[in-house]
């Protein structure tokens, strides 16, 4: 990792301004070994709060291949508390507008806006390069102009670089988002179906055990309307389920299809004989 910038960020109003200090931005690429010349390129910036944004609703062009994703570190407890609190809201991002502290600072290739957001326990930062959007807008404008003036240019001979640029920047992101959404939907659907099936099997086992217990009680001449018999029924059912707890776990995990009827019948008979032998 390599340190690329130090920021001082202003929050609050003009009359009640507060500055977050020691906001360090680090690049996480593997090519982070610095030589003596690179160490001098770390710049200092001052910034101001702009707005909160929903990370999920950011335009696709913001996180394309040309955007630099950084990690934020700090030694300031105040700065740490600020980001921990403000980024505690799910999917929230914080936008800051930043400018160099010195006029001589090399600002080429740097973005004017930084979006801070939380990814698990790490605060990450995306540098927003507005020139990308301006370039895309210009290219779209050129395409619309060409389509609206077919006499000035052949629509079939549109500049291939325009299409290639838009496709490479947008289609790859769109395909990735669609694919991820499909995978998440399939995973949720599969999980719900699996849960429904396991619950259904568990209910079937409980129903079978209940019927076996009631049949066993009738064979012993015990009336199901008496409170003592009902208590015996509940105790036997709980004990039967406990006896087959490992089988029920295997059912829920899908490792076995069903518990053999004979095994459940034997369990119920054994328990009823045990509970009624002194009756």
From Swiss-Prot:
It holds the Pfam family Sld7_N. GO terms for biological process: DNA replication; regulation of DNA-templated DNA replication initiation. Its main location: nucleus. It is found in: Nucleus; Cytoplasm, Cytoskeleton, Spindle pole. Keywords: Cell cycle, Cytoplasm, Cytoskeleton, DNA replication, Nucleus. InterPro entries: Sld7, Sld7_C, Sld7_N. GO terms for cellular component: chromosome, centromeric region; cytoplasm; DNA replication preinitiation complex; spindle pole. Required for the proper initiation of DNA replication. Required for mitochondrial morphology. Belongs to the SLD7 family. This is Mitochondrial morphogenesis protein SLD7. It comes from Candida glabrata (strain ATCC 2001 / BCRC 20586 / JCM 3761 / NBRC 0622 / NRRL Y-65 / CBS 138) (Yeast). The gene is SLD7.
């Amino acid at each position: 990792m390599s340190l690329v910038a130090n920021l001082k960020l202003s929050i609050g109003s003009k009359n009640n301004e507060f500055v977050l200090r020691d906001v360090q931005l680090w690049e996480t690429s593997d090519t982070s070994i610095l030589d003596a010349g690179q160490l001098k390129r770390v710049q200092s910036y001052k910034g101001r709060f702009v707005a909160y944004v929903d990370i999920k609703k950011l335009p696709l062009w913001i996180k394309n291949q040309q955007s630099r994703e950084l990690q934020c570190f700090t030694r300031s407890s105040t700065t740490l508390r600020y980001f921990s609190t403000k980024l505690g809201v799910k999917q929230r991002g914080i936008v800051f507008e930043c400018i160099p502290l010195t006029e001589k600072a090399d600002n080429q290739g740097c973005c004017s806006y930084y979006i801070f957001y939380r990814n698990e326990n790490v605060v990450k930062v995306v540098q927003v390069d507005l020139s990308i959007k301006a370039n895309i807008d210009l290219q779209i404008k050129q395409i619309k102009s060409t389509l609206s003036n077919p006499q000035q240019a052949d629509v079939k001979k549109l500049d291939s670089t325009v299409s290639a640029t838009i496709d490479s920047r947008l289609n790859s992101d769109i395909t990735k988002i669609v694919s991820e959404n499909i995978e998440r939907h399939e995973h949720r659907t599969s999980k719900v179906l699996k849960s429904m099936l396991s619950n259904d099997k568990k209910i079937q086992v409980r129903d079978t055990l209940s019927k076996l217990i009631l049949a066993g009680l009738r064979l012993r001449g015990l009336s199901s309307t008496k409170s003592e018999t009902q208590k015996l029924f509940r105790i036997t059912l709980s004990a039967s389920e406990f006896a087959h707890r490992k089988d029920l776990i295997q059912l829920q995990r899908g490792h076995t299809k069903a518990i053999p009827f004979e095994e459940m019948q034997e369990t119920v008979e054994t328990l009823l004989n045990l509970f009624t032998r002194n009756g």
